[in-house]
Structure formats: C-alpha cells, structure tokens
C-alpha cells in the first residue's frame, strides 16, 4: 500500500525560479464570471516564463470566502497600475505573495495511484491562510513552515485515493489582506468523493490557527481587462469561458493554452436577452389605483333587470317611478278627533300611523259620534256670532295614489261637508275673559286669588 510521507516530496523547481501569486478573496456568495485582477504584470523581465489563472469555489457553505481568484506568475515580475481603473473595494480584497517553497510528489509514485480523471477535472484544492504577529516574521520561522502550518498532518492524514500531489507556501509581499502566509495544497481526485477530505479538514481546524477551506475549479470569463493585464491581443480571446488559462512567454511573445472545452459568448445577444426579460410583466402585489389599458378594455356588462312580464316591463333607460300613497282625509280627521293616531319617525321623515282595523266596519254606522260632533259644532257656532272672525280659506289638497283615485265600494266619505275651523288668533279667549271675568287681561293669578279657601 502506498504510504504518504513528507519524504516522498521533492523541490518542484530545480532552477529556483521565483513564483508569485495574486490572490483575491471574494466575500460575496454570488458568482462572478470575471477574474478580479485590478493590476497588470510587468512582462519585460526575461525570466518570466508562465502565467496561469484559476477561479476556485468553496465546496461547503457558510465559509467567509466562497470564491477565490488566483493568478500564478512563474518568474520575476511585479504589479503595475498604469492605465487601469481600479476601485478601493477591489484592492482591499487582494494581496501579492511570493513563493517560499513548492514541493510535489515523485512522478513514479503518482503512476501507482488510480486516476479517475476523465473529461472533467476532478482535482481539488485546500487553502490555508495564516495571520501571525509582526515579531514572528523571521526567516527561521518562515523556513520551518512544514512544522507549524499543518502540511505534514495533511499529507499523512489524507486517505487514498485523495493524495496531496503538490504544496506551495507563500509569504506576503504587498496588498491589503491581513493574512501573512498562504498555503495551497493540490489534492488528486478529491472531487470523486469529497467526504473523506472534508473529514480530515474538520479534524485539523481545531489544531490550527488559520482559515481552512476546500475548493474546486470552476469556469471563468477571459474578458478584455484580463487580456490587457497579461499583454494579450484581446480580439482573439475576449468573451470566452474556460476553466484553464495559461500564457507562456518567450522572446516577448505570449502563447495561450486553454482547456479543450471553450464557450464563447456574444455580449450583444446577452444584452438582448436581458432586455427581453425586463420587459416581461411581473405580477404585482400592490393595489391597482390608476386605470390601465387592460382595465379600459374590459367588456362592460348590462345591469340585471326584472323578468319581462306585462306588469314589470320597463325600458332600461327609463328610471323607476315611485308613487307616494296617503290615507284618506276622512280617516285622518276622524282619527285625530278620537285620539287614535300615532306619529313615528322613519329616518328623517315623520309617519302618521292609523289603526282602523277594528273600527273600519263601524265608521259609517256609528251615529252617536256624528250626533256628538253636531252638538259640538252647534255650541261653537252659538258662541261665535258676535266675534269678528278673520281667517283665510285655504283649500285642502290631498295627494292620492293612482290606486285610490277610484273607490270600488262607492262609500260616502264622512265629514265631507264639515266646516273648516277658523285659525285661532286669540279672539275667542279674549271674548271669554270679557264675558265671564269682565276683563281681557284676566290672568290665572287673579283667578287663584278669588278662589274660596
């Protein structure tokens, strides 16, 4: 069985060429296809050999940096900002690091390992980020990185077929990131089954004072800004999606290597598709307060009408007519005399309620009431001949409903010829005071004064 040990690793670069990385730690969970590289590399150094670009995505959720952009440069180079528009937000998440040491396994040992790679790259990456004290940034502490960084534990604990094939340790040169050291370990066939590798990382986290995360490669966009930063002709590679992008430099000429599966995008078609989606009418949860075209075009419905019968037929344009009905004046006068009436209110209107149900049959045949009424009229007329009576004859008009215009019983109305009482202007009271008390100014106080005690 293959045994994992640090002795199986060897220095990766026999020529001792320096390696630099520009790393950008993205805190947003939303995936961005472009590479965050707001700088350009100096390409005039003859030792510059190769530049590689990778975009990594975290396997698990809930990590501080879900996405990481890395630009590898093998050879002497530096960062430039000439002709580039950068923002402070992009620069705060970036850092420039130089390789301290890179080790990898022997090729003969790697041939004994099972290879599950097919058309898709199944390798994974484990990234460690360390933040230490300033007084600990000594050359001795940096050279002993295999002891305190957890590199030995990772290489010995990782089970088959997940084998650590390459490890690179970097120290910070410039940038705004707070991490002083970064370790990148490449794990072969980690994406076949990531559970064993994740178990090892969860075992190591409490033992290390560092940020630990497992990542995999994803596709990214080779846009014009990236091509301009790497000194490439942007017309040949712009708007291409790939998961592998390498540039080899020789005699001031760059040769590009990309993965076999490349997807080219048309920006104009994407903008048209995005504009078409924005034009779609979305269902609104707000109340519609203004009239719209859809509301104006709604078919108007006719109002509901009664059945078309001879009694209820009516034109839709003719408003309904209401005929008020009133009781007969004979019943009103007779009821008022006998105090058989009652006034009730209905809303803002007054209604006179008459109860003639029990006396309807006796109205015409009841003679005592007629005799009493005649006697009262005679007494009243005897008292009035000597008094000047001034009154206005106001004809009585009673509105009657069409149903009461004709009485089918041909009944003779009571008190039809009854003389209308004159308006009381106080003359009758003055006449009584003069006749019985010899004074028109006679008051109730004088009456009480002469009353016998």
Swiss-Prot record:
InterPro entries in the cross-refs: DUF7153
Protein name, UniProt field: Uncharacterized protein C01C4.2
Superkingdom field: Eukaryota
